[in-house]
């Protein structure tokens, strides 16, 4: 009786993921168009009218709703809704709290993470375990997922590289026109011998869950200290003055310095006071 919806284009792997729900006998629902056309909660209106039981969106969409003060539960009936899935980028602790406070308090929130190349999830939700804000609950079935340090040792409660130590059902077996599998091996097995290196910067928490900090190739390394871009975005996005932001690492004086670009909301100027507030918040929380 499940009715599954994930907002996606046909070009994203979540389209394939959504079609896969048919194999379990579920009904799938599609939405074509801009998800905030004329109203911020358009997708929730769709979910309510179509009696969706699993509702899937991106973490960025949740952040946008939160920043705009949208409270979907005030206008829509979510009596059929059992699960909300989030992917595309790390869902912040604030995002978790927003969902439970403003959408539905007794829903199962499943933050999931995998990849287009595997059309699957390495880590995802689990109905038999508690949900902790900011964490992905557990490994996927058949996925021997771990976190390695730079030397290839397994680590807990420390940031490192997300890996899968054994073959798994949905891994690609080769690249097209890749003589000798050189590109394939370079993409996944060059960093750790015979271990799939996925390129996510993450950690395993004391609860046994996972926190994803962003892609390893976007990880900043000022002064030799690794810092995920998601850690900075989660701080900056809380400022009412900031509409959009992007952070990069720039080579500088034999090191890396962090450069933050921001777009302010209407009515605000980039004053010294705003700069200092943002810098202080990043220093304390990231």
Model-derived features: where do they sit?
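Conserved AMP-binding/adenylate-forming
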Residues: 48, 82-209, 216-219
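Hydrophobic alpha-helical scaffolding
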Residues: 7-8, 33-37, 50-55, 85-89, ...
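Conserved AMP-binding/adenylation subdomain of ANL enzymes
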Residues: 1-3, 10-53, 68
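Residues embedded in well-ordered beta-strands within globular domains across many folds
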Residues: 5, 56, 82-85, 146, ...
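Short, well-ordered beta-strand segments
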Residues: 3-5, 162-163, 261
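AMP-binding/adenylate-forming catalytic core of the ANL superfamily
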Residues: 48, 55, 168, 194, ...
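Adenylate-forming
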Residues: 9, 32-35, 52-98, 110-117, ...
């Amino acid at each position: 009786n499940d009715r599954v919806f994930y907002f996606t284009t046909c070009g994203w792997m979540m389209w394939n993921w959504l079609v896969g729900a048919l194999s379990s006998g579920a009904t799938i629902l599609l939405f074509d168009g801009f998800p905030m056309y004329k109203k911020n909660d358009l997708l929730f209106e769709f979910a309510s009218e179509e009696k969706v039981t699993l509702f899937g969106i991106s973490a960025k969409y949740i952040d946008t709703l939160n920043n705009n003060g949208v409270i979907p539960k005030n206008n829509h009936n979510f009596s059929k809704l059992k699960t909300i899935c989030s992917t595309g980028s790390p869902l912040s602790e604030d995002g978790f709290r927003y969902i439970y406070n403003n959408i539905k308090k007794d829903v199962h929130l499943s933050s999931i993470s995998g990849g287009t190349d595997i059309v699957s999830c390495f880590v995802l939700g689990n109905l038999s375990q508690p949900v902790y804000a900011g964490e992905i609950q557990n490994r996927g079935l058949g996925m021997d997922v771990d976190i390695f340090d730079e030397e290839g040792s397994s680590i807990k409660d420390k940031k490192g590289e997300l890996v899968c130590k054994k073959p798994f059902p949905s891994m690609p077996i080769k690249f097209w026109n890749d003589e000798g599998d050189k590109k394939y091996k370079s993409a996944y097995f060059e960093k750790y011998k015979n271990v799939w290196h996925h390129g996510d910067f993450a950690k395993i928490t004391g609860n046994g869950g996972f926190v994803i900090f962003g892609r390893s190739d976007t990880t900043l390394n000022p002064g030799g200290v690794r810092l995920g871009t998601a850690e900075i975005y989660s701080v900056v996005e809380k400022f009412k003055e900031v509409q959009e932001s992007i952070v990069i690492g720039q080579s500088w004086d034999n090191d890396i310095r962090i450069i933050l670009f921001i777009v302010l909301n209407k009515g605000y100027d980039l004053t010294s006071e705003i700069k200092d507030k943002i810098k202080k918040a990043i220093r304390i929380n990231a």
